[in-house]
């Protein structure tokens, strides 16, 4: 089974040749109120700009640098709120899963299951996610070549699910550093599935602060503009009202919410040029 070249999530279309779509939200689910504030702000912004939005957040960040790092509120607290967000804002929701068992538990509460980069080769994980029937977004491992994603996608489609998104989030470049090779985007597009560029994790410095990861937020727009100029189905951006004081260890690479409007306007302009729209 080949992957679908166009994947629809709610009313959002991901297609390498269609208008740019957005996956955005805070790194971690912090509270019901915070989730409602963020989802409401992003829904209002994207409706005004005319860009499709999938809201993302994580109930658990299982691959933190330190044992003492804040991981999130957990499934019991987050999943009921995901249901509320979908109903209240008519927004599709994406969250990541970390074990095979979580896939079936989480699937009824979201629209997209995300496979973290560190788990992108785990066959049993990919099969379990695929069998839920949900759209699957796979982050390309920092250790994988872009052409290796063909095998990752095949594990999902071979399990009966053609609705796959692939996300580029940088490749390991020495210690505590990632680099984005824009050649990866057309290579991944050749697989046949929509390609997403993760603009915020691509500037991450894994483990760069000793007990947590660092990041170079100032390069988010640079990389996002480059990726959109190449041509992608969507961009993935973690954002927060106050990232430097958030509970997330991804604070250094999250984009302040106030900076989102200007960035999205520029990216949409680049997208129109790249796709001749």
From Swiss-Prot:
SUPFAM superfamilies: Aldolase. It is found in: Cytoplasm. Its EC number is 2.5.1.55. Keywords: Cytoplasm, Lipopolysaccharide biosynthesis, Transferase. NCBIfam families: KDO8P_synth, PRK05198.1. It is an enzyme of class 2 (transferase). This is 2-dehydro-3-deoxyphosphooctonate aldolase. It comes from Mesorhizobium japonicum (strain LMG 29417 / CECT 9101 / MAFF 303099) (Mesorhizobium loti (strain MAFF 303099)). PANTHER family: PHOSPHO-2-DEHYDRO-3-DEOXYHEPTONATE ALDOLASE. Its main location: cytoplasm. InterPro entries: Aldolase_TIM, DAHP1/KDSA, KDO8P_synthase. Pfam families: DAHP_synth_1. It catalyses: D-arabinose 5-phosphate + phosphoenolpyruvate + H2O = 3-deoxy-alpha-D-manno-2-octulosonate-8-phosphate + phosphate. Belongs to the KdsA family. The keyword Protein transport does not apply. GO terms for cellular component: cytoplasm.
């Amino acid at each position: 089974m080949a992957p679908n070249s166009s994947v629809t999530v709610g009313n959002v279309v991901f297609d390498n040749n269609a208008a740019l779509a957005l996956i955005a939200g805070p790194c971690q689910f912090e509270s019901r109120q915070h989730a409602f504030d963020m989802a409401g702000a992003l829904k209002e912004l994207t409706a005004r700009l005319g860009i499709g939005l999938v809201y993302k957040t994580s109930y658990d960040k299982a691959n933190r640098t330190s044992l003492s790092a804040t991981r999130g509120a957990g499934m019991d607290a987050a999943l009921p709120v995901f249901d509320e967000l979908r109903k209240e804002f008519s927004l599709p929701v994406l969250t990541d899963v970390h074990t095979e068992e979580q896939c079936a538990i989480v699937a009824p509460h979201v629209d997209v299951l995300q496979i973290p980069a560190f788990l992108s080769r785990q066959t049993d994980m990919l099969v379990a996610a695929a069998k839920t029937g949900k759209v699957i977004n796979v982050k390309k491992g920092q250790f994988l070549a872009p052409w290796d994603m063909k095998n990752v996608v095949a594990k999902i489609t071979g399990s009966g699910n053609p609705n796959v998104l692939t996300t580029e989030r940088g490749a390991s470049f020495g210690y505590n550093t990632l680099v984005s090779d824009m050649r990866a985007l057309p290579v991944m597009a050749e697989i046949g599935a929509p390609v997403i560029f993760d603009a915020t994790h691509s500037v991450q410095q894994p483990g760069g602060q000793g007990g947590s990861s660092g990041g170079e937020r100032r390069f988010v727009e640079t990389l996002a503009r480059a990726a959109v100029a190449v041509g992608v189905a969507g961009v993935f951006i973690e954002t927060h009202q106050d990232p430097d004081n958030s509970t997330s260890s991804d604070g250094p690479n999250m984009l302040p919410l106030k900076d989102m409007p200007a960035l999205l306007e520029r990216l949409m302009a680049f997208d129109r040029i790249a796709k001749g729209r």
